[in-house]
Design a protein with these regions (language model features):
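Short, cationic low-complexity segments
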Residues: 733-758
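Periplasmic c-type cytochrome electron-transfer domains
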Residues: 775-776, 781-786
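A structured, mid-to-C-terminal "fold-capping" secondary-structure block
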Residues: 390, 771-773
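Amphipathic alpha-helical repeat scaffolds of TPR domains
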Residues: 833-835
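Intrinsically disordered, low-complexity terminal/linker regions enriched in Pro/Ser/Gly
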Residues: 762-767
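Alpha-helical transmembrane segments of multi-pass membrane proteins
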Residues: 1-724, 728-734, 788-825, 830
């Protein structure tokens, strides 16, 4: 393989172990990334700024590690021993993060409150957990690169190692998303990743020991990256690179002395467009697939697969072509590949004849999603993957740096661009200029990268050729920019249902925000629907209005003194509006993660939400509801939660045992909590998990049903702080008061004419449902089991079947839940019987 630093000689037979080591290292890194983002999101929140802090810190550590550690760790050190130390350090850091995070969370909550939880404090927490391991991760490839000679074949070998590392990322994404976290939990996933690190470290030490016993190469055994005709001195003193297809010094294609900076800039632009595209296309594909944990893992795996395969192709091309010219060609072709992906995602994939509502195994739909993702994004991913080894070989042609430092520089430039691209796209571009303009910007950036890559090769004798190339790049990029389509409004609204949606509804509003795309539709009969995550989230249809009003009115009418109220999730604002019109409420805080939702609630659902946006006693906080509750110093008399569907990635954090324990700790004496649980687009196991987890924290909880003509649809879970029963007479007396006229009218609009009608939606308590809940999995912060269970049923519509199996047979009237006069209790009994 060439001369290893520290006097160690490694020959060709050791390349396969090095590939395996980098594969294991990449697999572990992706598992860690998934686990750390999941766990840290529970601490600093899942809002877009918090997610940006996590991503920026993670990738920033990689960048610093690749750039700094190869300089600090001299080339005289045995690189395999250094690699082993890095892998062991990563394993130690991974285990440390898992075990010290609870203490960090406690300190964070103690330092921050909902008003002072600044980005700086969140960044500090992320840095404490992520910087040490990611700095070590960033140095692994540059350190191993010291095992090759600085020549064309050597840089090709580094490209293969990068390809192996990326292929490991594919395995890590699939293992984490489809097995380790679905079947086990974050702890098991961490231990598995640490085991891979230790295995890679031991393998490196074994190779170092074996190789050290044969310092002189055996006769007839070729050195890796050291064919005689390909020799290039590390110091850059060689006269030429004469490998087949290699660049020839003195020709018009040979880089100038200062051209390495152009190559670094090209690598940065390539990284920027790659991560910008990944962020944007993941958002758009999630609309079409349903934003489940499975969909995100699949999209990431396809993208990484393209990068890995492309890196292998680029490593081959680095030996057979002029690397700078090939790099320029890749960037030029990326203009077309980005345009293709934009067209495929907006104009092709949404209209493939797939009916997701047909009964089918989730595996079948995942196969279709895999094909669709590859069809759209694989071409671009292949080209981005090929760009790294080509940039490395092009920079290496300049000489002047040992392989570890040079690899670290190119890696750092690529990673720095990736940081800029991901953060700029997710936090600024998509929100300010939209998805279409963002993709147009990516095409323009790729065109600039193509010109930069070729610039060092231009000589006076080739000015005409250079001018023709530049003209072709600019003209083609300009044409492609004009051809980028907008995402169709119906796709934003209906997502995976686009091919089978009914005709008639008009999309009257669309918006792209930090967390996704949103829409409002109007049916011919005037019914309005608010869409998020590619499906209806709220509407003015009777069954939806009934559920949203139940969430709010049940909570405030049952609570002793509902002065301070927290509503998690604004949506159309109907639940928040229901609590806001209660005359007893003095302060209503609405925690909403997406700022774009405010405009929708204010402009389109004002009549239904009682003008909640703009109500002087309502405070709108744009934050992850869980994070706001954890950092708030106040206690609340009412907490009501109406999150996204539990199969939406991240929503399950609002259904965990730890979350309900947090809610219980924030409830004032006599306080009430309510939460929405859907029975449709879910599985029975998922519903059992939701209800069992709630009852685990609130043993006195109760289920209130929202049915459609007697059939199950969704339910409201309710619990009180303490064991006091619900006073039916008190609820009835409140509704009879003149100041409660708006509340009574609001309830009549959805079919509740009395307190008995409202409380008669009772469907059962913990004891009643004990047999049905037996064996249900508890959803915890460590396992987030719910998002995996629910993700298997997002296209299932078994609401009534689940409701029928859930209902207790012959259950007695809940005397411990309700209290009141005999007449009032008889009214509730009759209402329950009518249901």
């Amino acid at each position: 393989m060439g001369q290893v630093s520290g006097g160690l000689s490694v020959n060709d037979r050791f390349f396969a172990p090095l590939v395996a080591m980098l594969l294991a290292s990449g697999c572990a890194a992706l598992i860690y990334q998934v686990v750390w983002f999941q766990l840290l999101g529970l601490v600093i929140g899942a809002s877009a700024p918090s997610a940006g802090v996590l991503l920026g810190t993670f990738m920033g550590g990689l960048c610093v590690g690749g750039l700094v550690l190869p300089r600090w760790i001299g080339p005289e050190r045995n690189p395999l021993e250094v690699f082993a130390a890095l892998e062991a350090g990563i394993a130690a850091c991974g285990l440390a993060v898992l075990h010290v995070l609870p203490g960090i969370e406690a300190a964070y909550v103690g330092l921050a409150d909902a008003d002072r939880a600044s980005i700086a404090v969140r960044a500090l927490v992320a840095a404490l957990c992520l910087v040490p391991p990611t700095v070590l991760m960033g140095a692994t490839l540059p350190i191993v690169a010291r095992c090759v000679r600085a020549n064309v074949a050597g840089w090709s070998r580094v490209g293969w190692l990068y390809s192996a590392n990326t292929a490991g990322g594919v395995l890590g994404s699939v293992c984490a998303g489809f097995y380790l976290l679905r079947v086990h939990d974050a702890a098991v996933a961490t231990y598995a990743a640490a085991a891979l690190n230790i295995a890679a470290a031991l393998a490196a030490l074994a190779v170092a020991v074996v190789a050290s016993r044969s310092r002189a190469p055996e006769a007839g055994v070729p050195r890796i990256a050291e064919p005689p005709a390909d020799r290039l001195d590390v110091r850059g003193s060689a006269d030429a690179v004469t490998a087949a297809g290699g660049a020839r010094t003195g020709s018009a294609w040979s880089p100038s002395a200062h051209g390495v900076w152009a190559i670094h800039a090209t690598a940065a632009l390539s990284g920027m467009t790659a991560l910008a595209a990944e962020v944007l296309w993941t958002r758009h594909l999630a609309l079409l697939f349903g934003p489940t944990v499975y969909a995100f893992a699949l999209i990431l795996a396809v993208f990484l697969l393209g990068l890995g395969a492309g890196s292998g192709a680029g490593a081959l091309a680095a030996r057979r072509t002029r690397p700078a010219a090939a790099l320029a060609a890749c960037q030029w072709l990326l203009c077309a590949a980005i345009g293709w992906a934009a067209f495929a995602i907006a104009r092709s994939l949404p209209y493939w004849p797939l009916d997701v509502t047909l009964p089918s195994s989730p595996t079948v739909l995942l196969q279709a999603d895999l094909l669709r993702a590859a069809w759209a994004i694989l071409p671009a991913a292949l080209l981005w993957g090929a760009s790294f080894p080509l940039a490395l070989a092009a920079a290496g042609a300049h000489g002047g740096a040992e392989p570890g430092v040079l690899t670290g520089r190119v890696y750092a430039a690529n990673t720095l661009g990736a940081i800029v691209g991901s953060l700029l796209t997710s936090l600024v571009l998509v929100v300010v200029i939209g998805g279409r303009a963002t993709q147009q910007t990516m095409i323009a950036a790729s065109a600039c990268a193509a010109l930069l890559a070729l610039a060092p090769l231009v000589r006076r004798t080739r000015l005409v050729a250079a001018a023709l190339f530049a003209t072709a790049v600019v003209v083609s990029a300009a044409a492609l920019v004009r051809l980028v389509p907008e995402m169709p409004p119906e796709v934003v609204a209906y997502g995976r249902f686009t091919p089978t949606r009914g005709i008639g509804a008009d999309v009257i509003h669309t918006a792209e925000g930090w967390t996704g795309a949103f829409a409002v539709t109007r049916e011919p009969d005037g019914m309005l629907t608010y869409h998020g995550a590619g499906k209806a989230q709220a509407s003015t249809y009777p069954q939806d209005m009934r559920l949203q009003r139940m969430l709010g009115h049940l909570a405030t009418l049952v609570a002793d003194e509902p002065k301070r109220v927290l509503v998690i999730g604004l949506g159309a604002g109907v639940t928040a509006g229901a609590v806001s019109i209660d005359p007893a409420t003095e302060r209503v805080v609405v925690a909403e993660i997406e700022p774009r939702v405010r405009e929708i609630a204010a402009s389109y659902f004002r009549a239904q939400n009682h003008g909640v946006v703009g109500d002087p006693k309502v405070e709108l906080r744009f934050d992850d509801g869980r994070h706001y509750l954890a950092t708030a110093v106040d206690r609340f008399d009412v907490i009501t939660s109406d999150p996204l569907d539990p199969w939406v990635k991240g929503a399950a954090t609002l259904y965990t045992r730890e979350f309900w324990q947090l809610v219980r700790s924030r409830l004032a004496p006599g306080g009430v909590v309510t939460v929405f649980v859907q029975l449709y687009e879910s599985t029975e196991d998922a519903v059992r998990s939701e209800i069992a987890t709630f009852f685990d924290a609130f043993p006195n909880g109760a289920v209130f049903a929202n049915t459609v003509r007697g059939a199950g649809y969704d339910v409201v879970l309710l619990a009180r702080a303490g064991d006091a029963p619900i006073d039916v007479d008190l609820v009835a007396a409140r509704l009879a008061r003149p100041e409660y006229a708006r509340v009574a009218a609001s309830l009549r609009e959805v079919g509740f004419r009395s307190a008995a009608d409202l409380l008669g939606t009772y469907a059962g308590g913990r004891d009643d449902l004990a047999h049905w809940l037996d064996g249900a999995e508890i959803n915890t912060d460590r396992n987030l089991r719910l998002q995996y269970l629910a993700g298997e049923g997002l296209n299932r519509y078994d609401a009534n079947e689940i409701f029928e199996r859930m209902l207790p047979r012959g259950a007695a009237f809940p005397d411990r839940l309700f209290t009141g006069s005999p007449a009032a209790l008889d009214g509730v009994r009759r209402a329950i019987a009518r249901r």
